[in-house]
Amino acid sequence: MKAAEIREKFLKFFESKGHTIVRSSSLVPGNDPTLLFTNSGMVQFKDVFLGAESRPYSRATTAQRSVRAGGKHNDLENVGYTARHHTFFEMLGNFSFGDYFKRDAIHYAWELLTGVYQLPKEKLWVTVYQEDDEAYDIWAKEVGVPAERIIRIGDNKGARYASDNFWQMADTGPCGPCSEIFYDHGPDVWGGPPGSPEEDGDRYIEIWNLVFMQFNRDAQGNMTPLPKQCVDTGMGLERIAAVLQHVHSNYEIDLFQALIKAAARETNIDDLSNNSLKVVADHIRACSFLIVDGVIPGNEGRGYVLRRIVRRAIRHGYKLGRKGSFFHKLVADLVAQMGGAYPELKDAEQRVTHVLRQEEERFFETIEHGMSILEGALADLDSKGGKTLDGEVAFKLHDTYGFPLDLTADVCRERGVTVDEPAFDEAMARQREQARAAGKFKMAQGLDYTGAKTTFHGYEEIVFDDARVTALYVDGASVNEVTKGQQAVVVLDHTPFYAESGGQVGDQGVLANASIRFGVVDTLKVQADVVGHHGTLEQGTLKVGDVVKAEIDAVRRARTARNHSATHLMHKALREVLGGHVQQKGSLVDADKTRFDFAHNAPMTDEQIRRVEEIVNAEVLANAPGIVRVMAYDEAVKGGAMALFGEKYGDEVRVLDLGFSRELCGGTHVNRTGDIGLFKIVMEGGVAAGIRRVEAITGDNAVRFVQELDARIHAAAAALKAQPSELTQRISMVQDQVKALEKELGALKSKLASSQGDELASQAIDVSGVQVLAATLEGADVKTLRETVDKLKDKLKSAAIVLASVEGGKVSLIAGVTADTSKKVKAGELVNFVAQQVGGKGGGRPDMAQAGGTEPANLPAALAGVKGWVEAQL
């Protein structure tokens, strides 16, 4: 049975049991800031388990794309060297949200495994949590599993609830006892049953974990019952496929074998058991699907994890002898294997291929640049007799140049040097602390709130007269009252304030009554349907239960709405002008501007920018109404509504028709396109490989920008004594004049260098038959210095020369050595001898080298020492 059939049978089985088939969520979690990547099927349902979100179904089944690389759940270093570790895997799961519990979950699992997949019952073992008598009795008395094949597992990890059979997604969140199902490969394979000293062997393989969600663990480790008992199960597709295909390694299943053969094809390797091929086959899945979900290789966060995975794959290609680009060519093979189950992969094939190809090409630049920095640091360390590379240097390589720490450590190891990793970790921690400090007010998520939801009125109203305070927080802790001057978060039962979401910033405004005034500087979501108003109490004492008038800053809201609506029109225009591949990759909409990141592989031309502006402003002039409808997600997408990157959508969505644009959006917008006033793009640039950024302004900001631009044009025209309409022609004339003068100046400098060279030649000192010259050439640039050195080498025949110039407090140095002398006297070493004394460094060829410095006061002494240095080399 092939992997695709196993996946389909799983989903169809649970659909027949009343479950709704739910599409896989993004690998970038939309509802959990504690997770780097989606690493299990339950991630998209976390808020449902917590009671913070409702769904129209109580039973669900999924085939969830998952990644474990980086953070707590990190399998990266094991991938390729074990039978079952992967960076990317598919988790088959069934879920109950307060519907069925342990009994049905266990019976469903047994029926699927033994009935649909026809696994022999005697091959299946199960484990339960030590204290879970209910699950034990269901397995033993109802399913009929013999007692010797049911194993109780207690707290075997050194703490209460720290057990292989007590599951938790992270340090906080939903958790509960679990029951695991194992497959016995038989006595010919070494290993013991779970809980035994030999459990790490390959005989007994876990294939399914049934988690019975009963608790929510908070940051202090406290367990509170979930509002409803729930079921979360997970079965790795790769593991069950290995069992059903009668192989002992996941890499031997049909899906992986196709990718391994493709990797072998691109690397010209015949041995399909080579571990490096397994690494490449695994990594193409993780990298491709991460890019599908909007992750781009970068130097931090998810982008850095992706970059590490890509480079690890390429590094293994090098080990196999492949020196050129190859990794991106495997995308087509992956699409052939998985594009049917995940059409989003097929749709993004061209983009994924391009991003991976660019990252491969940049790999060489990154490694070369990073190596040059590391070599310089190691040379400096060697000159001081040190054996430990400063962790700050390693951190700079990591943070600025995207240089993996493990690669730095490998290079150092070859030189007998270690990396000060504690110092590296300190630098990383310092950076994180700075990031936390910068986001002082961004503390809404994570507040311990269990009260009523907030009803949002902001689409229709800018004022709500009778809002009741349901919770108050100071420094993240719940309080009953706030006094004057305190910063706090206020939760209301009703609000017109829009909470930051979908790229749109939160509202600002005031909460007030006769004795209270609270200034709101930001609005963020505490939970999916709970709004936190962040700010400072300016007057009175605010208590839980108080009733206030909630009023937003209407002018700021209107400006933000103009920019948000313009973003929709711009997105549509970009797709028309640049192509349908344009997808939103991020946005920031505030009162001043809209910043829009999108997938595109080249800078926009001036003509393309003008065309986008023309299209958007035509829609503005059309003054079309904005029409909002609420409908099912699938219906909206089928109707042409655009779903955006990074957004988490429920089963019912808000669809906005605005002019020629139709998008899913929960933000605030203008009533008619004419309310935007004027649209103007003010910036276009690149932010990452394959990602462009546009900034635009609207309304009075756009009018002001155009007026200021017109004033600058008139001022420039006046300075050049021309009319504004003649400005381009006049600038061209001035540029031609400047070029002619620069050419004339260059000729004069060359002539001066020639005459100075003749004069300098007489200053050379004979040292053992070599003419040594070290001098300053006033007013010379680097080009003039180099030309003069070349002429002096020709004139002096056998020579070692250093020429210097000083301009703006900076020293320029050129060293030249004739061919007959360069075996003993190297130009690079000579120029470095001088450069080190003037606060710089340099390098170059044995016959010609260049350097710079920042301490011109030391230059005379440095040049005076050249004769002795050359003498020592001869």
Curated annotation (Swiss-Prot):
The UniProt record lists the keyword ATP-binding: yes
InterPro entries: aa-tRNA-synth_II/BPL/LPL, Ala-tRNA-lgiase_IIc, Ala-tRNA-ligase_IIc_anticod-bd, Ala-tRNA-synth_IIc_core, Ala-tRNA-synth_IIc_N, Ala-tRNA_ligase, Ala_tRNA_ligase_euk/bac, DHHA1_dom
Cofactor note text: Binds 1 zinc ion per subunit.
Entry keywords, A to Z: Aminoacyl-tRNA synthetase, ATP-binding, Cytoplasm, Ligase, Metal-binding, Nucleotide-binding, Protein biosynthesis, RNA-binding, tRNA-binding, Zinc
EC number, as in UniProt: 6.1.1.7
Gene Ontology molecular functions: alanine-tRNA ligase activity; aminoacyl-tRNA deacylase activity; ATP binding; tRNA binding; zinc ion binding
Domain of life: Bacteria
Principal cellular location given in the protein's record: cytoplasm
CC annotations in GO: cytosol
Binding site for Zn(2+): H564, H568, C665, H669
GO biological process, one term: alanyl-tRNA aminoacylation
Subcellular location: Cytoplasm
Chemical reaction(s) catalysed: tRNA(Ala) + L-alanine + ATP = L-alanyl-tRNA(Ala) + AMP + diphosphate
Keyword Metal-binding: yes
Cofactor: Zn(2+)
HAMAP family: Ala_tRNA_synth_B
Free-text note regarding domains: Consists of three domains; the N-terminal catalytic domain, the editing domain and the C-terminal C-Ala domain. The editing domain removes incorrectly charged amino acids, while the C-Ala domain, along with tRNA(Ala), serves as a bridge to cooperatively bring together the editing and aminoacylation centers thus stimulating deacylation of misacylated tRNAs.
PANTHER family for the chain: ALANINE--TRNA LIGASE, CYTOPLASMIC, ALANYL-TRNA SYNTHETASE
Family to which this protein belongs: Belongs to the class-II aminoacyl-tRNA synthetase family.
Function (record text): Catalyzes the attachment of alanine to tRNA(Ala) in a two-step reaction: alanine is first activated by ATP to form Ala-AMP and then transferred to the acceptor end of tRNA(Ala). Also edits incorrectly charged Ser-tRNA(Ala) and Gly-tRNA(Ala) via its editing domain.
Name of the protein this chain belongs to: Alanine--tRNA ligase
Native source organism of the sequence: Paraburkholderia phymatum (strain DSM 17167 / CIP 108236 / LMG 21445 / STM815)
